[in-house]
A protein has these predicted regions:
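Helical subdomain adjoining the active site within ATP-dependent kinase catalytic cores
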Residues: 7-118
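Short Cys/His-rich micro-motifs in 6-15 aa windows
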Residues: 116-127
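Long, charge-rich C-terminal accessory regions
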Residues: 125-152, 156-158
Length: 195
């Protein structure tokens, strides 16, 4: 048995303990914790390239107050929809094949250019669906935004979640097919769409 008379080695500030283990145990604050910047980082990608507002709120609830109080964490129910919404707002760069949010403005070009290689964003189709308050008043923000680039001669599959409530079992089911060609753009209902 080893004994150190200077004190307990586990209490030393610069011990060699695994910082990742401490993080997994909830002993360190989240890197973006709004109330504790002890574990913050200036390195890595900007959060605006990684997280939507909805994902940011979920992460903050999970790893902020929820880090030490599990009952404050959002349930698993909220994550699939937030992740699908984030994925539906990304485009693929034709220059480097990286993905990024369609509304990103590159700080150097002050335009919609890829954050990784500055290639201009391709032309995109933006579909927005709204929930309604009464029969003739839409709520202010769209409940879903679906963004995809449309290269000539391609077919785009629009999933059911754009038009209907998000359901885990069928949110990816093709509802509408959009194809682009020399003669124009064709929009048709999928064979798998609801009647």
């Amino acid at each position: 048995v080893l004994f150190r008379s200077e004190g307990d080695w586990a209490d030393e500030e610069n011990d060699d303990g695994d910082i990742e283990d401490k993080a997994y145990a909830g002993l360190l604050p989240w890197v973006d914790d709004q109330n504790d910047d002890a574990n913050s980082s200036d390195s890595g990608l900007p959060r605006s390239l990684l997280l939507t507002a909805k994902l940011t709120a979920l992460f903050e609830s999970t790893f902020g107050p929820g880090r030490t109080s599990p009952l404050l964490r959002p349930t698993i129910y909220h994550w699939p929809e937030a992740l699908a919404q984030a994925a539906d707002m990304t485009v693929t760069c034709p220059g480097c094949s990286m993905h990024y949010y369609y509304d990103f403005i590159h700080p150097e070009t002050e335009a919609h250019h890829c954050p990784y290689c500055t290639t201009p964003r391709p032309q995109v189709l933006i579909l927005e669906s709204y929930r309604w308050k009464g029969t003739d008043t839409p709520l202010e923000l769209p409940c879903w935004r679906y963004v995809r680039e449309i290269p000539p001669g391609s077919e785009l599959t629009v999933p059911r979640r754009v038009f209907d409530e998000f359901l885990m079992l069928d949110s990816d089911t093709a509802e509408v097919l959009i194809s682009s060609g020399d003669e124009g753009i064709l929009i048709k209902k999928s064979d798998h769409a609801r009647s």
